[in-house]
């Protein structure tokens, strides 16, 4: 059985409180590949209990978890030493790096090298969501010090796997890729079966509830608040690790719920009002496959996850969102038809399609 090594900044179970769209996608990818390959994971932060199966093993430390400069520097040193030691003792068939670990890439150490790009950490020209002044300074310093190195990595790896056509185009432009055919779009796997009935808002006897996940300025929380003010007879429920205390009677804190089925059962329509270009839109696909209509920003990879009628192009304009919500309330037949079309779109994100795409890459 061939061996694959993943060099990851973190390896989390989807139910871990620290999990994100990227860590969930990595977890599901590794779970699928472990049915065909031996998997080694080198990561300083592992929160998976139990380890998925006997084909997966981890090299970890868990000593340097935290955001302090000391921990970050120690983590970099740990990466460097651990990757060097790993290659001294092992000869994997495939090495997989990510945005965070690609600085340690050495094409001579493995016959096939793959780079996973699910986010913007290497895009030093792009301001990150929620970036503060210190983070902005660090990004600009990285741009000065690391741009040449990162461009070299992107052009030397054998394959780049990314999570949307939007990201593919951004990678080609940002890193001046000379062989764009090596960039493979593998949509993140969504392991929610479409067995949930459509939630028709015209049949709801109680007050309709519109939901949002992780509101923040980058996620467009001002849209959420503006809609709550415009529709006082509609409940607005948000889910996050922290209670934001919005001080509006019809805005309800739903807590943090890792189980998506339980979360989506509490709302009738989801908005994804991101004001920055999301690489993909996992939550919108999960909601569609859970029977919910979803309205999304025309931003980044979000537009690839739903039918075009669910997309708002002028996504920074509150009036556009108000009009779309009113459209949803007044055109329930069209709303359901648009949801059905979005459900068809979501079929390209199912676990089986993801596995097929992965095997085409890793078997070649």
Model-predicted segments: where are they?
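Active-site proximal beta-strand in glycosyltransferases
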Residues: 5, 94, 107-140, 161
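Conserved acidic donor-binding segment of nucleotide-sugar-dependent glycosyltransferases
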Residues: 215, 309-319, 327-332
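Donor nucleotide-sugar binding/catalytic pocket of nucleotide-sugar-dependent glycosyltransferases
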Residues: 155-196
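A charged, aromatic-enriched C-terminal amphipathic alpha-helix characteristic of glycosyltransferases
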Residues: 74, 316, 333-363
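Conserved catalytic-core segment of nucleotide-activated headgroup transferases in glycan assembly
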Residues: 192-194, 199-249, 253
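Membrane-proximal helix-turn-helix segments that form the acceptor-binding/catalytic region
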Residues: 28, 84-85, 136-160
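N-terminal subdomain of nucleotide-sugar transferases
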Residues: 1-47, 90
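Short hydrophobic beta-strand element within catalytic cores of glycosyltransferases
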Residues: 293-296
């Amino acid at each position: 059985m061939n061996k694959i090594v993943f060099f990851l900044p973190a390896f989390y179970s989807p139910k871990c409180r620290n999990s994100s769209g990227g860590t969930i996608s990595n977890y599901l990818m590794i779970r699928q590949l472990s049915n065909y390959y031996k998997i080694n994971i080198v990561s300083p932060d592992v929160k998976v209990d139990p380890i998925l199966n006997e084909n997966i093993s981890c090299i970890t430390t868990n000593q340097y978890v935290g955001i302090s400069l000391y921990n970050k520097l120690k983590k970099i040193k740990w990466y460097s030493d651990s990757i060097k030691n790993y290659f001294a003792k092992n000869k994997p068939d495939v090495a997989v790096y990510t945005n965070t670990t690609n600085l340690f890439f050495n094409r001579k150490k493995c016959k096939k090298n793959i780079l996973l790009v699910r986010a913007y950490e290497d895009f030093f020209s792009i301001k990150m969501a929620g970036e503060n002044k210190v983070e902005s300074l660090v990004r600009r310093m990285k741009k000065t010090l690391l741009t040449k190195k990162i461009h070299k990595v992107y052009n030397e790896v054998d394959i780049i796997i990314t999570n949307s056509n939007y990201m593919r185009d951004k990678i080609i432009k940002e890193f001046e890729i000379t062989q764009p055919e090596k960039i493979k779009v593998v949509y993140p796997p969504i392991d929610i079966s479409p067995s949930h009935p459509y939630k028709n808002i015209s049949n709801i006897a109680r007050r309709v509830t519109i939901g949002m996940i992780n509101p923040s300025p980058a996620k467009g929380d001002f849209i959420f608040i503006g809609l709550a003010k415009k529709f006082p007879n509609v409940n607005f429920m948000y889910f996050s690790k922290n209670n934001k205390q919005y001080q509006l009677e019809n805005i309800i804190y739903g807590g943090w719920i890792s189980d998506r089925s339980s979360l989506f059962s509490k709302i009738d329509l989801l908005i994804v009002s991101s004001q920055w270009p999301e690489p993909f839109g996992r939550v919108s696909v999960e909601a569609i496959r859970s029977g919910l209509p979803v309205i999304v920003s025309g931003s980044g990879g979000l537009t690839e996850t739903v039918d075009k009628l669910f997309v708002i192009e002028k996504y920074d304009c509150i009036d556009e969102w108000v009009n779309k919500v009113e459209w949803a309330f007044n055109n329930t037949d069209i709303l359901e038809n648009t949801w059905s079309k979005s459900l068809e779109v979501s079929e390209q994100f199912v676990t089986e399609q993801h596995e097929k795409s992965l095997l085409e890459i890793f078997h070649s």
